[in-house]
Amino acid sequence: MAADKACAVVLRDRGVLDILAFEHPLAGLQLVKGSVEPGESSGAAAVRELMEEAGIQATAKRNLGEWHSTITGHIWAFHECEVAQDLPDSWVHFAEDDGGHDFRFFWHPLMSEPSDRWHHIFKDALSFLRASLA
């Protein structure tokens, strides 16, 4: 079965490996992810979602594998995305999702346990990524 969700993984290494994450004003802390549209590859979907949710242009650099969420039944494809510019420590991007929201972006230390502010599905996704990138 093909992946129906794509997750854009943007990493930075400043002595600690960080992953790009954001705070959704209604749904807590999350990773950039969304649905794969008909005829779209999961890598292209990850790049598109990164532009829509974060305003970042990127290229899909590396496929990090697929994960089946037992919570939702969706299959997620993780793609490491490379961005051309240096990204700040934090910023806010207005995303058009669900009528429009300000998403607050930040860097989460990948090997740190996520707090209770993360939805359980994203905690599980981070566990998958920690194992994949270890």
PLM segments and residue spans:
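Conserved N-terminal beta-strand and adjoining loop/helix that marks the start
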Residues: M1-I19
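Conserved hydrophobic "DFG−1" position in protein kinase catalytic cores
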Residues: V10-L11, A21, C81, W107
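Short polar/acidic secondary-structure junctions
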Residues: D13-R14, H68-T70
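Conserved Nudix-box catalytic region and its N-terminal flanking loop in Nudix hydrolases
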Residues: G15-E52, I56
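Structured beta->alpha junctions
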Residues: S35, W67-H68
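A short coil-to-beta-strand element that immediately follows conserved catalytic motifs
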Residues: Q57-G65
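Active-site-adjacent beta-strand/loop module that shapes the phosphate/pyrophosphate-binding cleft
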Residues: S69-P114, I121-L133
